[in-house]
Amino acid sequence: MSKRYLAVAGAAALSLLLAACGSSSGGTTSSSAAAPSSSGSSSSAAGGGAKVGVILPDTASSARWANNDAPLLGDAFKAAGVASDIQNAGGDKTKFASLCDQMIGEGVAVLMIVNLDSDSGAACETKAAAQGIKTIDYDRLTLGGNASYYVSFDNVAVGTAQGKGLVKCMQANGKTTGPVALLNGSPTDNNATLFKQGYEAAIRAAGYSITADQSVPDWDNTKAGTIFEQMFTKANGNFVGVDAANDGLGGAVIAVLAKNKLAGKIPVTGQDATDTGLQNVLLGTQCMTVYKAIKKEADAASALAISLAQGNAPTTQLGSVKDSKTGKDVPALLLVPQAIFNDSVKDVVADGFTTAAKLCTSAELKAACTKYGVS
C-alpha cells in the first residue's frame, strides 16, 4: 500500500469526523511531544466546561501508549480548550477499574478507554453508561461493552498486511511452501483475534501450512520468548517463516533465532513500526512491520471526544463494526494501515512518526539507513 493512499484514506476519514465537530478543534502537535508521567496528566479548560477522561492500557505491550497516544491526545484537548484527565492503567485491571470509577466520579462527559480485556472494559462502560457518559473504545473494541463509538485501524487489514508481507518475504527467500509459526497477541484482546484472522487467511491462501500456533498472555515479550523457544525446539527449528503479531513479539522471536544463528534467515513479521522494530527491518532480522499512523488515530479520536464533550453529535457518515458478543453494531471510524519493508522505512520517518537520529544509531544501522534512504 502506498504512502499516498495511506495519507489520502486517513485524511478523508478524518475530514468526515472533523466536519461533524462544528467549530471545535482537533489539532495536535507532533508525536515528539513529551509524554506525561506514568501516573498520567490532567488539564483544565480555560473557561471550564465538560471534561474528557482517557484510560490507556499499559506501557509494556507497546511504547506507543506513553510516547505517542498520551501526548497527542493531551495536546489536542488543550488546543481545543477542553479539560482532560489522561491516565495509564499500567497493565493492572484493578487500577483500570479504579481509574474508571475515579473519572466517573469526576463527572467526565466523555470517557475514552483502551481496554485491558473485554470483561473489565465492559464493566467500566456499563458504569459510565448508567451515568449518561458517552464512551469511546479507542484502538480496541470492547466486546460486550456499551461503547458509543469506536475509533481504530481496520485490524483485519492490519493482519492481512502482515500475512501478505510474510508471504512476500518467504517467497523472496525461495520458500514457496512450508511450515509457518504463528505467535499471536493476547487471547483477551479482540484486536489480536482480528489480526490473526487477517494473517492466517493470507498465509493459508498462499499455500503454506501452519504447524505451530500460540498466543502470548498480555502481549508479554518475556513470555513470548519462552513460548517461541518451546515452539522452535518442538519443531526442531523447521519453520520457513514466523508471523509475530507485533514488533515486541517479533523481537522475542528474533532473539531466539539469533541464539540459533538463524536471525535474518527465517522471515519474521511485526506491527506498530516501533523504533526497535524499524531497526530490525533495516537490519534484515525482521522482514516487515505494519505502520499505523497513530497521530491520525489520535486526531480522529480526540476530535470525536471534543465534539461529544461540547454537546455535538458526529454525522451518520461513520461506518460500523459488529460486536460479536452482543450482535450490536457500534458506530466506527476505521483507518488504513501500511505495510513497511526495508525500502519504505523512510516513509515512516517522512511522516514524522520517528526520526533518522532515533533509528540510525550504530555503524551497521547508519549503513542500512544510507542504503534505504532514511535521512
What are these regions (language model features)?
Residues 8, 48, 183-187, 191, ...:
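Hinge/cleft segment of the Venus flytrap/periplasmic-binding protein
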Residues 20-34, 38-41:
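Bacterial lipoprotein signal-peptidase II cleavage site
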Residues 46-47, 51-97, 114-118, 184-194, ...:
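Extracytoplasmic "Venus flytrap"
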Residues 48, 52, 96, 151-178, ...:
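Hydrophobic alpha-helical segments within soluble ligand-binding/sensing domains
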Residues 64-79, 158-165, 190-209, 227, ...:
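Short, solvent-exposed amphipathic alpha-helices that sit
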Residues 77-89, 178-182, 200-221:
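Short beta-strand elements in bilobed, periplasmic/extracellular small-molecule ligand-binding domains
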Residues 101, 105, 110-130, 199, ...:
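Hydrophobic alpha-helical
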Residues 119-157, 164, 168, 173-179, ...:
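Flexible loop/hinge segments that line or gate small-molecule binding clefts
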